[in-house]
Amino acid sequence: MSFRDRFQNLKETVGQWTDSSGGGSLDRKIERNLAEMEGGTEIERTAAVKALVIQAQTDDKWADPIITSFLRVLPDQLASPQEAIIDGLLELRKIKVSREGEIFESIQETLDSPYPSVRSKVVEIWTRFSLKSDTKTSDTIAVLFEMLSDDDKDVRYQTQESLSKILHTVPKVALPELKNAIGDDDWRVTYHSIVLLTEFAKKYPAPSVVLAPEVIEAFNSGERLKERAADCIGMLGLANPEAVKPAVPGLIKGLEGKSSELRKACATALGRIGSKNGMVVYHAVPRLARALKNDDWYIHVEVVKALGYIGSSKPALVKPHLAIIRNRTTTGADRNICKAAEWALKKAGGG
């Protein structure tokens, strides 16, 4: 059956169950829908839930019993009825404000739902909840950080996007939670948290620097996180080179790593740090010059730019290597390398 047919069936079923004409009182219709919500097919259950929401809004005496039934069956429902119940509970809390606490507690528990679509839905709800002016608490934000360890990639990336909104809206509340997340034992939580901090540091570098020790520790903890952590360290180094100085030996070592992406990220980070204080990265200059001589031309643009940035801060550090930079203005493996070398030569005082 096509999606359109399934949708039409659902629409017709809801219509049948909410139609006031036909046999039976409203009470019997509600009782039938409550039973169908637990024993019908997925489509029938979803339709029953939608009908019950309307019926609870129609007859107040049924609102509490229907909410209670929703809370009871929510954990064990299939994907579509779970989503329908969540939507229904959010609607019914408006008429039963006293039950808001248990409703949100029950919805939060569906973050453990076996269905990625449900988990994604709850992440979106929790994001809205976290951004409300009267509920900007670390507890709700901490729940979202836990979702960065979700087994489903789409859920993780949606959570990352949601946390980015929160981080940019309430940084004072979110940054302490981000700090904890960067130090999490689950590499996925750390990975996504570093990406979040990197983006945040581009706009708000000063408050981000306080997390430099955690990022450096992540960089040194294993290969899985090095590339992203190097990128973040470079951004933090633009704000405060001294804060990331402990990372420089690892970044230098990374220039000779197995991955071209890691070598490129380390070169970029060293250039960013060196653009603000060349002396912090002075040990890296000979290694960068050596990297221009190897066959991995994929990283040469970032390497030569790093030398240019460092040279703009401390020309004397790069002066012994101007010849290799000048050579790459004509012998670079592609035009981008040649142009980057020309730029670097001027920045370092050799052009």
Language model features: what each stretch is:
Residues 323-351:
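Eukaryotic acidic, Ser/Thr-rich intrinsically disordered low-complexity regions
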Residues 24-35, 60-73, 97-110, 134-147, ...:
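Amphipathic alpha-helical scaffolding segments comprising HEAT/armadillo-like alpha-solenoid repeats
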Residues 147, 152-165, 169-172, 177-178, ...:
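Solenoidal tandem-repeat scaffolds enriched in leucines and small polar residues
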Residues 42-43, 79-80, 116-117, 153-154, ...:
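Alpha-helix N-cap/helix-start positions at coil->helix boundaries
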Residues 217, 222-293, 298:
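Eukaryotic tandem repeat interaction scaffolds
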Residues 46, 50, 64, 68, ...:
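Alpha-solenoid HEAT/ARM repeat scaffold
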Residues 2-46:
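N-terminal "cap/leader" segments of large eukaryotic alpha-helical scaffolds
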